[in-house]
Amino acid sequence: MKKIKIGIIIALVLSFSYGITAAKPAPQEIDKVVFIHYPVPQGQGAYWFPAKAPAPTDQNTKYKYSGIHWAVPYVEYLVNPSGAPPESESAINASFDAWQSAPGDIIFEYQGATSISGSVLDYGNVVSWGNITEDYPGAIAVTVVWYYRGIKEIVDVDTIMNSGDPWAVNAGVVDPDAETGNAGYYDVQNIMTHEAGHWLMLGDLYQWDTQKLTMYGYGALDELRKRTLGAGDKLGIDRIY
């Protein structure tokens, strides 16, 4: 009888141990989303003007969200200033601040400069400049988001601004004391505020009446309006966080 009891106890211990091992979560598969920011289409037929569409306004409440998100509302990021115009880091910080100041509980924390560039899954979040024309012809900027496919949690985000394009801090703002202004440039803060929306997984909007929202999908030279979030941008971030 003693041997039988011992055997039963051992069997129960092994069964319990096996149950713990089997309960370990399976490895998560990682997938990615690529957001490509293109210039405003030019030429005849570039836009469709609906006869009864409402006029574009920053009070438009539209937004697009896929369900992918950060596990916690705290995101650290680095900036590679190589190839960027002077004072770009301050402009980029202001871009993230626009979302941090919106409804919702998202916190962005600047961790300083880095030499890392490009888009690599290294579990670090980086803004850099690089020539992306070959891979993304005509693109102003590209943001790549890696995430766990099963639980839809973000693990890494990188934005690359196209170094082949003209960039300036305060683009289009003419200094009255200077002979020339910054006309004919993409504004760093304007474009990066849009890209920061992708860091939070808000998608691009292309409807006619969304042109004055930050998440409108096209960018333009000397444009500044994306620096300030519209109603739909704020509603989107408030829903996620």
PLM segments and residue spans:
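Positively charged n-region of N-terminal signal peptides that target proteins for export
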Residues: 1-6
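Disordered inhibitory propeptide/activation segment of secreted metzincin zinc metalloprotease zymogens
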Residues: 18-87, 143-151
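Metzincin-family zinc-dependent endopeptidase catalytic domain
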Residues: 88-193, 199
